[in-house]
């Protein structure tokens, strides 16, 4: 159930709200300043939903409402960082692209979980799509795809479905176009859901550099990791 609270009494009819994706039906009812909306079927974990509707006050004045949220994941998987590959190369004999590898410590669903990584100038983000994973599975998030058809997200039983550079037949491959890892100094953090503190993370820098961080992008992630 989704609840919206206003600063004065409002009225709605049951069909006052609709959703995208349209497969989810929204039934609304009001009680004083609150509007309760039931969604059927429930959004899958991490599914992006846009809720749109209209409410009226006792004088007939209407207000348009639009809310975007993700389906709640009550069984987030527990994943930890196990390998980071930066400094992609285009070698014909041994090419490599940027990726982050995770190991699943506790099975669950990846939907709604996300990864952030930062350079000195930019913060990038990948939202995992709904996918059931088991303990000890390997997940590889590729951050510099070539954009070829063989690069496929592996959400089903076939973990050898995807091709592409650095794809693995033994783990689940996911592909992000948000941007690659910085070669020298960067930070990575992993989250169960929006608004939560990171459950794991990693900071790296050039051995020749020392002193305090000067990038606000890197500092924001490193501070969360230290909390």
Regions inferred by a protein language model and the residue ranges of each:
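Short, surface-exposed alpha-helix to beta-strand junction/turn motifs within ectodomains of secreted
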Residues: 2-27, 113-115
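Solvent-exposed beta-edge/loop recognition patches
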Residues: 30-32, 36-46, 130, 135-227
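Contiguous beta-strand segments of beta-sheet-rich domains
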Residues: 46-54
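Short, solvent-exposed loop/turn segments at the edges of extracellular beta-sandwich modules
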Residues: 55-62
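A structural motif detector for short, solvent-exposed N-terminal "entry" segments of globular domains
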Residues: 1, 63-120, 177-184, 198-208
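Short alpha-helix capping/helix-loop boundary micro-motifs
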Residues: 122-129
């Amino acid at each position: 159930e989704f609840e919206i609270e206003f600063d004065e009494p409002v009225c709605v009819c049951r069909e006052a709200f609709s959703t995208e994706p349209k497969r989810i039906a929204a039934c609304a009812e009001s009680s004083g300043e609150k509007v309760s909306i039931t969604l059927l079927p429930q959004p899958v974990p991490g599914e992006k939903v846009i809720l749109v509707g209209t409410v009226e006050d006792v004088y007939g004045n209407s207000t348009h409402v639009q809310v975007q949220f993700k389906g709640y994941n009550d069984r987030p998987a527990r994943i930890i960082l196990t390998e980071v590959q930066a400094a992609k190369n285009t070698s014909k004999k041994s090419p490599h692209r940027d990726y982050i590898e995770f190991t699943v410590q506790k099975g669950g669903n990846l939907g709604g979980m996300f990864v952030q990584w930062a350079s000195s100038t930019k913060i990038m983000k990948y939202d995992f799509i709904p996918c059931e994973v088991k303990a000890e599975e390997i997940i590889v998030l590729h951050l510099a795809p070539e954009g070829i058809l063989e690069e496929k997200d592996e959400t089903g039983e076939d973990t050898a479905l995807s091709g592409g550079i650095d794809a693995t037949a033994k783990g689940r491959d996911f592909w992000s176009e948000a941007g690659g890892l910085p070669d020298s100094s960067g930070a990575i953090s992993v989250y169960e859901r929006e608004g939560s503190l990171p459950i794991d993370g990693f900071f790296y820098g050039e051995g020749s550099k020392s002193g305090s961080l000067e990038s606000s992008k890197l500092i924001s992630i490193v501070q969360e990791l230290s909390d």
